[in-house]
Design a protein with these regions (language model features):
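Conserved ABC ATPase signature
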Residues: 165-169, 173
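ABC ATPase nucleotide-binding domains
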Residues: 265-291
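Conserved catalytic motifs of ABC-family nucleotide-binding domains
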Residues: 186
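The feature captures the beta-strand-to-loop junction immediately N-terminal to the Walker
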Residues: 64-66
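Conserved ABC transporter NBD signature motif
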Residues: 87-95, 104
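Helix-to-loop junction immediately C-terminal to a conserved catalytic motif
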Residues: 79
Length: 291
């Protein structure tokens, strides 16, 4: 578990309840679960039990939990690349797993932990691919497409990287460009799987602060998978806390961040206090039993 402290927003809901009820809801995750069978002779294994929450345009939801807790499974269910065993995920009222590949690519942008380059490309060319994420062949791009790609780079503070080759970029620079490609899709829903992986502390804070501004300014609904307690606490509107496939709590960070609960989930002695921003800040402390 990484404890990143960034520099110096509700009532608790049970996992079975929807966290908000509002006509402006864009994303609705309703009692979603998932299981798989390792082989035909074994009973299905639950990787995610019933989970529910809602999110509006302009909000950031953090899916928080230790490794192998079901976070990435939930993200794939939201993206529609996995079909739920039960429940449903609705984007503007439509089940995401029922969307065609083209429609899904137009409405949902996904930033994976690792994005592989299929061929050498400059940063702006890589971002330009986001204009036609469902396409499988190269095509001539319009002036509008190019302008959107350039603007996406500017939105993430990477305009100066446009003409550089992707292979030359540092980890933080590459992550900005990958995010810009997702923004170039102009999606309704932006999904990120551990976007701060391999980034130093300053780059992690910078990325999440940028996401906060982008969500508000462009009315994106953002769902980010992370194990970074302080980043989620500082920048997320809601936190979905998961452990071993079970959704333990959903709500604002100030509601979810209860010391005993976090210690149970992360198996570490912790302290929780309010930071300068009024949001919870978590620190690792010496084992209270002196072990």
């Amino acid at each position: 578990m990484s404890m990143v402290a960034p520099p110096a927003v509700g009532a608790m809901r049970s996992p079975g309840e929807v966290s908000r009820v509002n006509n402006d809801v864009r994303l609705s995750v309703e009692q979603v679960s998932y299981a798989y069978s390792p082989n035909l002779t074994q009973a299905p294994l639950f990787t995610l039990e019933a989970t529910s929450f809602q999110a509006r345009a302009g909000e950031i939801v953090a899916i928080l939990g230790p490794n192998a807790s079901g976070k990435s499974t939930l993200l794939k269910l939201i993206a529609g690349t996995l079909e739920p065993l039960s429940g449903k995920v609705l984007l503007n009222g439509f089940p995401t797993h029922s969307l065609t590949a083209r429609t899904r690519a137009q409405r949902i942008a996904m930033v994976q932990q690792e994005s592989q380059l299929l061929f050498p490309a400059r940063a702006w060319e890589f971002v330009l691919q986001g204009r036609h994420p469902h396409g499988r062949t190269l095509r001539f791009e319009s002036a509008t497409d190019i302008a959107v790609a350039r603007n996406a780079l500017a939105q993430v503070g990477a305009a100066q990287l446009g003409d550089r080759w992707m292979a030359e970029l540092s980890g933080g620079e590459k992550q900005r460009v990958i995010l810009a490609r997702a923004l170039a899709q102009q999606p309704l829903l932006l999904l990120l799987d551990e976007p701060t992986l391999h980034l130093d502390i300053a780059a992690q804070v910078d990325l999440l602060l940028g996401l906060r501004h982008l969500a508000v300014e462009n009315r994106y609904t953002v769902v980010v998978v992370t194990h970074e307690l302080n980043l989620a606490g500082e920048y997320a509107d809601q936190v979905v806390l998961i452990q071993r496939g079970k959704c333990l709590r959903v709500g604002p960070p100030g509601v979810v961040y209860q010391r005993e609960l976090l210690e149970q989930v992360f198996q570490t002695a912790l302290s929780v206090e309010l930071g300068p921003s009024g949001r919870p800040r978590v620190n690792v402390v010496a084992d209270r039993e002196g072990r």
